[in-house]
Every structure is written in structure tokens, then in C-alpha cells.
């Protein structure tokens, strides 16, 4: 058994390619089933998001498994196998386990430490579980990865620091006002940065938002898309009278918010605070508009300093999380190695107890006059002899779990005791072998 991960992500393929190799939500169930029916695949989980499509699989042979996964992806999206090879990266064994842990923790994301991927990985695993394409190893490993990621986020707060200018603007507003719910907010501009700011504001609990723009149609489109208010740029001085927060991001060559405008508006305002955040280049808000102690003004350089500091903090948190991953990989390996020992020990115990049972049957035939008490004593002592005899072999078998040649030595162990440990994938392998046989027969008798 081997663990293999094949990943198409932001490092291996540009966005145009990634868009072509993403499974739709309604196609994922069938994709899991199709892959599970593929030769060499014993367990599989498929993760497909806007930034990555990944196949995690337990395979019986590395080279065969890798080829059939790549062929599956090629067939699913209409590419050649070589195309899939060129746009993907392959991880095997410990590297695959490490990759899964990094992805689930957000260390492999475009935005370092983001938490959305954790939910996406959890959903992918639950879907695979529901379809029954996971087994003993993945049921344990994916739970381990999800638990590790949750713990990492809780212990480091890696996702708490803003690392985009638009998000930093909202975080700055939280620092000034505390809770943002109920704050009247103006967004100047209707472009991408304005929309990102709008989304972050909505996510923070603000619902009293007005979009203003020189072109009223654009303000209308953005506002109606997200269920907020809109107005013309000419209405800005009036709106400023009651506003708490202003975020500006236009492409205007001239100042939109001037010092004279703020001086005029401030005469009509109560003593409440006004936060002006300028994320435009060139600047939309004239410098030195903070004419009183209750007016706060920040530009993109101020926010960039906050973002840079937060990025450094995120990187430190990411480094700490990454330092924990080798221990997690080792813990998984220890568990897998012990997993191989358990069926061997079980088979040894079953053989020993079969011998004991047959011995008791023989005693019953030869000594039919034994009382129940005598029979119980004999049975108890024969079991005790067996347990004493098995004590050292079982101890040795358990120690093999940490041996680099554990598979080879466990096979020798089974030969010595003439036992055959059950293969947990025996039924799956038999099903695939039968399917291949049927395909071969159809091919032989095909006249096409």
C-alpha cells in the first residue's frame, strides 16, 4: 500500500488552466466513484476548489497508481496525460502526508494561513466517506489532518491578521470603533477594490453601506449586487454629515475628498468620530484632512505597513505550524506500521486458540467422564500455556512496527508460524481483478 497525492495548484498551473480542471460540485460524487473503480486505487479523496484540484489515493503500486490517476484526470477534463503531468506535482509517502497537512492548515494557500481550505478539505473527506471511497487509512489520516489544522489555527491565530489592503481597511475600522455594527459607511468607487472592501464590511456586520461613484450606473450595479444603498458622487458632502467610515478607491487623478469639504462637513457633524481610509493610487483623499481630534485619516502606505507587519506575523505562525508537521508525519507512520502488525497478531492468536479448542475437543473424546469443574480447569490452564507461549512472539511482532524492513520481517514471521494475515483490501482487489477479467473477455469477443 502506498499513499500518493497528485496536485494541480497555483504553483503548477495558471488560473486559465486551473479553471479547466475543476470539478463542478454536482460532478464530484461521480468522479469519486469513477476513480475508485480504476485499477490500483484502494482509497481515494478528491479536493476541488477555485485554486486547486487534488487527488489523494492509497494505491497498490506507485507507478501504476500514478499513471491511472493522471489518466483519470486527463479523461475527466479532456487533456492528454502528458498535459496533466506538466501541470501537476506528485507527492508519495511521507511527502504526500506532509502535503496534506500543509494544504489543510492553509500553509500551501495563495493567502497564507487562510481557513477556508480547512472546511473544503473536511467537505471533500466527508463526501468520500459518504460514497465509501475511503477506508481504514484515510479515515484515520484525514481526521488527523483536520484535527491538526484546527489546533494549529487555534494556537497561533494565523488567520486573524489582515494580509490584503481591503481587509486591512476593515480591520483598522475595528480598531478605531470596536464593534462595527450600526456604523454608517460610504464606499467611494465601484471597482474591484471597492467590492472587496464592501464584502469585508458586510462580513464584519455592517449593513448601513452606501456606494457612491462618478458614474451612477456603476454604483447602482455594485450596490444592487450586494443589497446595499447607492448614490451619486455629488451627494458625498451630504452623506459625510452622518457617516462614520469612508473607504475610497477610485482611479480619479484629482482628490475626491478635500480638506475644505471636511472643514465644511465638520461644522454640521456632531462630535462623533469620522474614519477616512484611502486605498487609491493616486490618492483620493487630500492629505491633512484630519483637522480635528475626532477625524482619522489613513492612506494606502499606512495600510501597507499594517499588512506587512501582519504578513510577518503570519509567516512566523506558519513557520511554527510547519515545525510541527514532521511529528505528525511520524505519528501517522507509527500508526500505519502498527496497522500492519495487528492482523498478524490477530492471525497468530486465532491459530493458537483454534489449536486450544481442538485440543479440548480431543480431551473430551478421550476423557468423557471429566466433570465440568475439571474441564474448566484444564481449559483455563491450556489457554494460560498458549498465552505464555505467545507473549514473546507478540512482543517481537509489535517491535517490528518500527523496523525499516517491517514488511519483509512480518512476512517471515507469518511463514515461521504458518499464518496468513488478512489483507484489508482483499475484497477491493478481488473486485478489480474480476472487473479486469470481464473487460478482457469482452475485448476478446468484440468484433468492433
Swiss-Prot record:
Record: residues binding NADP(+): 189-194
Site-annotated residues for Important for activity: 99
Q: What class of enzyme is it?
A: oxidoreductase
Instruction: Indicate the transmembrane segments per the record.
Output: none
Q: Where along this sequence does the record place binding of substrate?
A: 49-52, 109, 114-116, 120
Q: Where is the active site?
A: 50
Per the UniProt entry, the Enzyme Commission number(s) are 1.2.1.70
Query: Keywords on this record?
Result: NADP, Oxidoreductase, Porphyrin biosynthesis
Q: Which CDD domains match?
A: NAD_bind_Glutamyl_tRNA_reduct
The pathway is: Porphyrin-containing compound metabolism; protoporphyrin-IX biosynthesis; 5-aminolevulinate from L-glutamyl-tRNA(Glu): step 1/2
What are the protein's GO molecular function terms?
glutamyl-tRNA reductase activity; NADP binding
User: What reaction does this catalyse?
Assistant: (S)-4-amino-5-oxopentanoate + tRNA(Glu) + NADP(+) = L-glutamyl-tRNA(Glu) + NADPH + H(+)
GO terms in the biological process aspect are:
protoporphyrinogen IX biosynthetic process
Record remark on domains: Possesses an unusual extended V-shaped dimeric structure with each monomer consisting of three distinct domains arranged along a curved 'spinal' alpha-helix. The N-terminal catalytic domain specifically recognizes the glutamate moiety of the substrate. The second domain is the NADPH-binding domain, and the third C-terminal domain is responsible for dimerization.
Family membership noted in the UniProt record:
Belongs to the glutamyl-tRNA reductase family.
PANTHER family in alphabetical order:
GLUTAMYL-TRNA REDUCTASE 1, CHLOROPLASTIC
Enumerate the NCBIfam families for this protein: hemA (TIGR01035)
Q: What else is known?
A: During catalysis, the active site Cys acts as a nucleophile attacking the alpha-carbonyl group of tRNA-bound glutamate with the formation of a thioester intermediate between enzyme and glutamate, and the concomitant release of tRNA(Glu). The thioester intermediate is finally reduced by direct hydride transfer from NADPH, to form the product GSA.
Function description: Catalyzes the NADPH-dependent reduction of glutamyl-tRNA(Glu) to glutamate 1-semialdehyde (GSA).
Q: Subunit info?
A: Homodimer.
Q: What is this protein called?
A: Glutamyl-tRNA reductase
Organism the protein comes from = Staphylococcus haemolyticus (strain JCSC1435)
The taxonomic lineage of its organism, from the top, reads: Bacteria, Bacillati, Bacillota, Bacilli, Bacillales
